[in-house]
From Swiss-Prot:
Protein name in the entry: Aspartate/glutamate leucyltransferase
InterPro entries xrefs: Acyl_CoA_acyltransferase (IPR016181), Asp_Glu_LeuTrfase (IPR017138), N-end_Aminoacyl_Trfase (IPR030700), N-end_Aminoacyl_Trfase_C (IPR007472), N-end_Aminoacyl_Trfase_N (IPR007471)
Family recorded in the similarity comment: Belongs to the R-transferase family. Bpt subfamily.
Record gene name: bpt
Subcellular location: Cytoplasm
Key words, A-Z: Acyltransferase, Cytoplasm, Transferase
Length: 252
């Protein structure tokens, strides 16, 4: 029997399940555990290869007949918001974001629960309890933060009402947005878009070149918003390809 080093990741393949993005397709995922002293280093390496993190698991699609899921990362240092994106920034100028330690709160869960009920009531996360939420935030062996967005108080400082939050990993070369959510009662603010814009600005100020947005699927309305943040890179079999306003993918 082969003895594997505890530092050598072991990969597993899930059984096929219905794809949540493309009707009539089946999805499978390859995954491994992120534990131990090398978890952060492994998470960085796997993220560069198109994996995503969920708690102490790193996964990526491994579907038999489909390669539609494409990993996307925004080039933070070159990003310039379009006119419409500048409007989103202006609309949310009264919000203050603070990057905090990954500690769950009842206030966060209240927003999270309302967001799921309004946006994803039939999804795989619909039944998450407060304990499930706490696990999502705390079960991490990598550098994870939660960015809270609150209304600015009369004094101009943070401390007002929480309206959104983003669970975020800090990688060696960027910020990876693990999961973000917002108060559905202020849907007109485009808070999902605003949080991405804020993360791009944060990455730039931290000297990090990229913001990882997860998977983009061409033709999927659920994923189309990710194509708005240009220039970006998309992972292909030949490595990361640059996509700018022309929509043409080129080797960077």
């Amino acid at each position: 029997m082969t003895q594997h080093s505890r530092n050598t990741p072991q990969f597993y393949l899930t059984a096929p399940t219905p794809c949540p993005y493309l009707e009539g397709f089946q999805e499978r995922k390859v995954f491994t555990h992120l534990v131990g002293d090398k978890a952060g280093e492994l998470n960085d390496l796997l993220t560069h290869g198109g994996f995503r993190r969920s708690q102490s698991i790193a996964y990526r699609p491994a579907c038999d007949l489909c390669r539609a899921c494409v990993s996307v990362r925004v080039i933070a240092g070159e990003f310039e918001p379009s006119r419409n994106l500048r409007k989103v920034l202006h609309r949310n100028a009264d919000l203050v974001g603070e990057m905090r330690n990954a500690v769950p709160t009842s206030e966060q869960y209240s927003i999270f629960r309302a967001y799921l009920d309004a946006r994803h009531h039939d999804g795989g996360m619909a039944d998450m309890t407060v304990l499930d939420y706490a696990m999502m935030v705390e079960d991490t062996h990598v550098t994870t933060r939660i960015v809270e967005y609150r209304r600015r108080t009369d004094s101009g400082k943070q401390g007002g009402e929480l309206v959104a939050a983003a669970l975020t990993d800090v990688l060696g070369d960027g910020l990876s947005m693990v999961y973000s959510f917002f108060d559905p009662d202020v849907d007109d603010r485009s808070l999902g878009t605003f949080m991405i814009l804020d993360h791009i600005a944060r990455a730039r100020s931290m000297g990090l070149p990229y913001v990882y947005l997860g998977y983009w699927i061409e033709g999927s309305s659920k994923m189309s918003y990710k194509a708005r943040f240009l220039p970006q890179q998309r992972l292909s079999p030949n490595g990361w390809l640059r996509v700018d306003a022309t929509g043409i993918a080129t080797q960077d």
